[in-house]
Amino acid sequence: MTDHIAAVKTYLLDLQDRICAALEAEDGKARFAEDAWERPAGGGGRTRVIGDGALIEKGGVNFSHVFGDSLPPSASAHRPELAGRGFQALGVSLVIHPENPHVPTSHANVRFFCAEKEGEEPVWWFGGGFDLTPYYAHEEDCVHWHRVARDACAPFGADVYPRYKEWCDRYFHLKHRNEPRGIGGLFFDDLNQWDFDTCFAFIRAIGDAYIDAYLPIVQRRKHTPFDERQREFQAYRRGRYVEFNLVFDRGTLFGLQSGGRTESILMSLPPQVRWGYDWKPEPGSEEARLTEYFLADRDWLAGQP
């Protein structure tokens, strides 16, 4: 798998560079700061963070490549056949929290995992996806986001987008709140149903689609005026983001349990959050419409070309 791992690593480093350049250009003020780090147990990465910009209040685009002699519990719990295997995990993960409540938070991740044991076939798979978390949502933005997702999946089969869209809706769900984190997108894991080259081509299609999905929405919304009440609602909804990442997110749990770099793992958390006891939006308000209409499992592309 050595050549395969090298090819994936080269792609992921380039993807990180391209996404950072596009986001810096869109912000126009802030620049990413890079923190290269090493993991004592094996591997390391490039954490890049940005904040206090004209657009981005806090964000990060991380690359990591970690390896070790045995898997953490979060990885082997649902794959007991991997126990006793050495592993390599590579990925790019990003979260962008804009200051303007009219610009959604976005998250994307593409990753590769390989577990090897002498004398046995390697076990490998890809995972990833991207999802959108609006605060003041617009239907045209939701349609655009999902159209880009569908088009990225299309060359790999007509069933791919619906399957991974549904998986995303199911995965990014706060069970204790019985509500989705956002309006979804794509999510997939354990991808090895095709040969390596096809799976790798698919992961590249998804990684490359993120900027095409996100920047047009940013450009439409970043100059929309907002007030303090809307910022407070954004902070309240960001609380849901924190709850999901710390309680349910498999990537967060894997990173913490595998001795990953805590600062990089928790980079996804927003800078300002608030919780209010049993707070509910005014009936009929924009805030109420978010949960009543947008945060529902729906086919955003029904009737769309």
UniProtKB/Swiss-Prot annotation:
NCBIfam families: PRK05330.1. The lineage of its organism: Bacteria, Pseudomonadati, Pseudomonadota, Gammaproteobacteria, Pseudomonadales. Its EC number is 1.3.3.3. GO terms for biological process: protoporphyrinogen IX biosynthetic process. Pathway: Porphyrin-containing compound metabolism; protoporphyrin-IX biosynthesis; protoporphyrinogen-IX from coproporphyrinogen-III (O2 route): step 1/1. It is an enzyme of class 1 (oxidoreductase). The record marks H176 as: Important for dimerization. This is Oxygen-dependent coproporphyrinogen-III oxidase. GO terms for molecular function: coproporphyrinogen oxidase activity; metal ion binding; protein homodimerization activity. The gene is hemF. Belongs to the aerobic coproporphyrinogen-III oxidase family. Substrate binds at S93, N109, V110, R111, G259, G260, R261. A divalent metal cation binds at H97, H107, H146, H176. Transmembrane segments: none annotated. The active site is at H107 (proton donor). The keyword Oxidoreductase applies. Pfam families: Coprogen_oxidas (PF01218). The keyword Metal-binding applies. GO terms for cellular component: cytoplasm.
